[in-house]
């Protein structure tokens, strides 16, 4: 059988096998968090992490960019550009190089150095921008005509969602076509949440899964929570979040292009949107590492913090099976210095 998400090729838009770019994608594992039960509280039920950090370039961005670059190859596109907080740029650089397509990447000024170097090392033209991700997106958009590149920003092309859809297809298969009750997803641009909801509806239409479909929970950081604010206010679109700040850079998206699609998926699934403080994110990250040996990225840790928070609030029950998405390996992020030295002289 075909490995990784190309096993679902019949449900994906790439028509020619020779255009299916691959860097050795795998089915990402499900890891139970049994030892975190005491920290989570008495109400804690069965909670599982889907660790997307095992994918090429170390993040779930590999799914969307692999599919989108494959379609770019199929359609004869020669130049691609993307704004990124780090991981999307790394994935684009790797897959574009694999496909022999030129790529241009624009990062906020405070993007971790390891991410910028990774992007450059894999062949992309990369620049730091004095601003946030939306400023980078504006540069990419304005340069489309002048530079002749194709805009690969979130939801500016239709195929990244198709790649992210494979998270839902894969998860359903891993659960023997009976998906979990709740999915908690770190939400910035929200492509993955939208794509998974699309996957579950497609699987339902062909009779592979049945109701109830998973409740989709959009998790954001308290320092950048435009989707949560819009959800709580009953709005269909989100407004720009001013002065966005959080340790979870991947979900620091002040204005998501697909805000209305995120909110629609959350509401259609009877889910909700919630935000957690940075202190809770860091505590969850430490708990998973120290108790379970699971190195969550800050965005993934946000889902664990949110699970604890919503167990206490009652919006999630201990009887519900819950999957938390860890969107990247924690090894790609700066860690606190804890070295102890021993003098052997």
Predicted regions and their residues:
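PLP-dependent amino-acid enzyme catalytic core
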Residues: 1-345
């Amino acid at each position: 059988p075909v490995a990784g998400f190309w096993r679902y090729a019949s449900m994906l838009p790439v028509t020619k096998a020779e255009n299916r770019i691959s860097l050795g994608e795998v089915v990402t594992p499900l890891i139970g968090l049994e030892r975190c039960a005491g920290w989570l509280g008495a109400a804690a039920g069965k909670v599982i992490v889907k660790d997307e950090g095992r994918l090429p370039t170390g993040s779930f961005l590999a799914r969307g960019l692999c599919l989108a670059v494959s379609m770019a190859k199929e359609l004869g596109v020669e130049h691609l550009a993307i704004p990124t907080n780090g991981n999307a740029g790394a994935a684009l650089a790797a897959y574009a190089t694999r496909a022999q397509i030129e790529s241009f990447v624009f990062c906020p000024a405070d993007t971790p150095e390891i991410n910028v170097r990774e992007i450059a090392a894999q062949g992309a033209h990369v620049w730091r921008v004095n601003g946030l991700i939306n400023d980078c997106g504006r540069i990419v958009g304005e340069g489309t005509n002048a530079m002749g590149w194709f805009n690969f920003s979130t939801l500016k092309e239709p195929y990244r969602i198709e790649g992210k859809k494979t998270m839902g297809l894969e998860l359903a298969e891993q659960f023997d076509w009976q998906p979990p009750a709740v999915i908690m997803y770190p939400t910035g641009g929200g492509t993955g949440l939208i794509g998974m909801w699309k996957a579950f509806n497609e699987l339902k239409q062909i009779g592979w899964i049945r109701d109830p479909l998973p409740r989709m929970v959009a998790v954001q950081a308290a320092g950048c929570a435009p989707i949560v604010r819009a959800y709580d206010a009953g709005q269909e679109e989100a407004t720009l979040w001013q002065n966005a700040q959080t340790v979870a850079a991947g979900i620091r998206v002040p204005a998501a292009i697909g805000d209305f699609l995120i909110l629609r998926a959350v509401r259609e699934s009877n889910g909700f949107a919630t935000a957690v403080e940075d202190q809770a994110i860091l505590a969850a990250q430490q708990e998973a590492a120290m108790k379970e040996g699971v190195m969550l990225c800050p965005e993934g840790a946000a889902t664990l913090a949110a699970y604890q928070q919503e167990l206490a609030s009652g919006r999630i029950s201990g009887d519900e099976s819950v999957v938390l998405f860890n969107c990247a390996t924690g090894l790609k992020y700066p860690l606190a210095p804890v070295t102890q030295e021993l003098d052997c002289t």
